[in-house]
């Protein structure tokens, strides 16, 4: 996934495009995962952030998906907190 993108547009549950600000990208080598953290672009005061997993199909096309596995989410949350503490 292109790492220099500041904003991305994603489809919400209703099929409408919503613009998100990219907070950070990071990789977790232990589980061979790549992740992106985004927040709604139109609400700068929003404390809500979404962590999405980057997956690739056989042709190399990338898609962002929610993290369903609780253990994976816990690892991702720990890695995100580490990344953010290093950026401060």
UniProtKB/Swiss-Prot annotation:
It comes from the Bacteria. This is UPF0473 protein CLH_1128. It comes from Clostridium botulinum (strain Alaska E43 / Type E3). Transmembrane segments: none annotated. Belongs to the UPF0473 family.
